[in-house]
Amino acid sequence: MADLGVKAGDKVLLVWSQPSSPTTLKKLAESLGAMVGTDGRVSLENMERLIMSSHAASSYDWVLSSLLSDSFSVHTSETLAEMARVIKPDGKLVLEEPVTGTDDQKVRTAEKLISALKLSGLVSVTEVSKEPLTPEAVSALKTFTGFQGNTLSRVRMSASKPNFEVGSSSQLKFSFGKKTSKPVDKPALDPNAAKAWTLSANDMDDDDVDLVDSDALLDADDFKKPDAASLKAPSCGDGTTKKKKACKNCSCGLAEELEQESKGAKTISQPKSACGSCYLGDAFRCASCPYIGMPAFKPGEKIVLANTGLNDT
C-alpha cells in the first residue's frame, strides 16, 4: 500500500465486498492506519451499505475500493457517484474490478469502466495495472454474475476529483466600463505598390506589346439602329408557299403579330339593333324587328335572315 501515496493526516474510506477474509481486511486496515497516523482516520464500509450509510460530502482524502485480492466487485454507476460525492476536492479514488476483453452485458471492458468513472464526475482516470484473476475469484465471479467467458482479468483504476465541488459556482468579474481604444498604427504605404495599382495600359512602355484600341473596332454602321425587317431571317414568316409561322424562340416580333391577327379573326360581329334585346325572343323584340318569328339565340351567334324578311312593304 505504500505505492498509493497515502500520507499522515489523510482520511481514508476503505470499501470492501464479499467474499473477503476478515484477517486480510484487518491487516489492510491496520497498515493504512499506520500510514495516516493519529491525525488521520481509516473508516471501513461494506459496498452494499455505502449509499445507505450517508457519509458526509467531501469528507475523505482517499476512497479505496475492492483492493483485497480474495474479493471482487462490479461497481455500479450509483456506487461510483456516491464515492465521488464523499471524496474531497483533489481527492483520490483507487479501485479494482474484474473486466473482460470482449463486450458483455454482465462484465464490462476496461474502456467502459473508464467511461463510467468519467461520467460519475471524476477526472484523470488512468489504468494502473492489470493482472489475471485467481481461480477462486473467477469461479466466484461466474457464480455471482453468470458470466461464462474466459477473457477475465483484474484491473486497478486511479481517478481524481476536480479541485471544486460538483455544482459549485463562482462569480465572474466583468468590466463594463468604457474602454478607450488605442490608436492602431497603420503600416506605411509603399509608393511603388500604390503606383502599380494605378497603372493603365497606356502607361506600359513596352514596344513588344501591340495594343488594340477598342474604339477603333466599331464603324459608323455598327452604331445604326436596325429596323424590324432586317432582323428577320430570310425564311421567317414567308407566306408565299406556306402559312406564316413564327420561330420557336421568335424575337423579331412576328409571334406577336400573328397573335394579334388570330385574335382579330376570332372576333365575331355582334348583331346590331336599336334595343339590343333581339336575341331574347319575340317578347322583347320591336314590331319592325327583322328577327320576328325566329327563336331566341345567344349573344354573338351568327344569324342568317331570309331576303323576304328584309323587304319593306
From Swiss-Prot:
Listed InterPro entries: Anamorsin, Anamorsin_N_metazoan, CIAPIN1, SAM-dependent_MTases_sf
Region (Linker): 171-223
Residue ranges of the region described as Fe-S binding site B: 275-289
Region Fe-S binding site A, annotated ranges: 236-252
Names of required cofactors: [2Fe-2S] cluster; [4Fe-4S] cluster
Residues annotated as binding [2Fe-2S] cluster: 236, 247, 250, 252
Lineage: superkingdom: Eukaryota
GO cellular component: mitochondrial intermembrane space; nucleus
Region described as N-terminal SAM-like domain: 6-170
Assembly, per entry: Monomer. Interacts with ndor1. Interacts with chchd4.
Recorded family membership: Belongs to the anamorsin family.
Function: Component of the cytosolic iron-sulfur (Fe-S) protein assembly (CIA) machinery required for the maturation of extramitochondrial Fe-S proteins. Part of an electron transfer chain functioning in an early step of cytosolic Fe-S biogenesis, facilitating the de novo assembly of a [4Fe-4S] cluster on the scaffold complex NUBP1-NUBP2. Electrons are transferred to CIAPIN1 from NADPH via the FAD- and FMN-containing protein NDOR1.
Name of this chain's protein: Anamorsin-A
Species per Swiss-Prot/TrEMBL record: Salmo salar
GN (gene name): ciapin1-A
